[in-house]
Regions:
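Alpha-to-beta junction loops
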Residues: 68-69, 86-96, 139-140, 179-180, ...
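Extended ligand-binding regions for polar small-molecule ligands
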Residues: 28, 53-66, 122-125, 129-148, ...
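Ligand-binding clefts/hinges and TM-proximal coupling segments of bilobed small-molecule sensing domains
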Residues: 8, 20, 148-169, 244-282
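Periplasmic-binding protein-like
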Residues: 40-41, 112-124, 204-247, 263-282
Length: 282
């Protein structure tokens, strides 16, 4: 069966199910038996083809809660990712997507995180809280181009000594995060600023481990903290409600999963959510 024929057959079956259910007009092409997630094939700590990322594990958890089988469609998370995955019906949910991005419809957020500074132990930068800290003036800082930290660095006159890494790469061949960590280890840069999940994951696995400082005290105009949910097609309203329910019912377990990957997660007052704070909850 060709891919097109398969899609048409799936579409026809969905139409029949919708009619049998007394559907009022909106058509949802969500597989009733398979939790069809999509992600990047090589983008740890989020996902990889071996199923080792926290988004992979979250998909496993939610599939089990629904009693569904799990399947994954992989595509490099660069330009065209949403269109090539959700848009072409290769999957029914993108497991991690920032609020405010209008390419797809979002669920409620299941975590909140921020950009973070990563430094070596003994660097004298371990307690830097903002990009405006005078100690960064003469430092060579690694930063991913066209991200909020690069905007704040420009506002503070820090780009002259910065080393820039590309925002969009084919993750099957390159990793800006790993390149930054390698440069920090070799002394090519003095510190780096990464998206929080990457900063936490890679800092914990470095040898020796690096210090991660979430930039929660940053007061510049560019937003540094974001809520992350899941993305579905705009037509899939009932599916979105199902995912919202699952997130609410399993938030504590989701938090534990994120913490196990050293992801810096924050509550709405920017206080860190840690294993210790979770243990104190009733």
């Amino acid at each position: 069966m060709t891919a097109l024929a398969g899609l048409l057959a799936f579409s026809q079956a969905a139409r029949i199910r919708a009619q049998q259910a007394g559907d009022s007009g909106s058509l949802e092409l969500v597989d009733p038996d398979v939790f069809r997630a999509c992600g990047d094939p090589r983008n740890m700590p989020f996902s990889n083809e071996k199923g080792e990322g926290f988004e992979n594990k979250l998909a496993e958890l939610l599939a089990a809660k629904l009693g569904k089988k799990l399947s994954y469609a992989y595509f490099p998370q660069a330009t065209g990712f949403v269109r090539m995955t959700l848009g072409f019906f290769r999957c029914d949910v993108i497991m991690g997507f920032p609020q405010g991005d209008d390419q797809a419809q979002l669920t409620i957020p299941y975590y909140r995180t921020t950009y973070a500074l990563i430094v070596k132990q003994g660097s004298g930068l371990e307690d830097v809280a903002t990009i405006a800290d005078p100690r960064l003036k003469d430092k060579r800082i690694g930063v991913v181009a066209r991200t909020p930290p690069s905007t704040v660095m420009a506002m503070n006159g820090l780009l002259a000594h910065a080393k820039s890494y590309p925002l969009f790469v084919d993750t099957r061949a390159d990793s800006s995060a790993q390149a930054m960590l390698d440069d920090l280890a070799s002394g090519e840069i003095d510190c780096g600023i990464l998206w929080g999940p990457m900063a936490g994951y890679y800092a914990a696995r470095a040898n020796p481990p690096l210090v991660m400082v979430p930039l929660v005290k940053e007061t510049a105009a560019a937003p540094m903290t974001f809520r992350i949910g899941m993305a579905v097609r705009p037509s899939d309203q009932e599916w979105k409600r199902t995912l919202n329910r699952l997130i609410k019912e399993n938030q504590a377990e989701i938090n534990k999963l994120l913490i196990s990957y050293n992801i810096p997660i924050l509550d709405e007052s920017n206080a860190p959510i840690t294993a210790e704070t979770l243990s104190k909850e009733p």
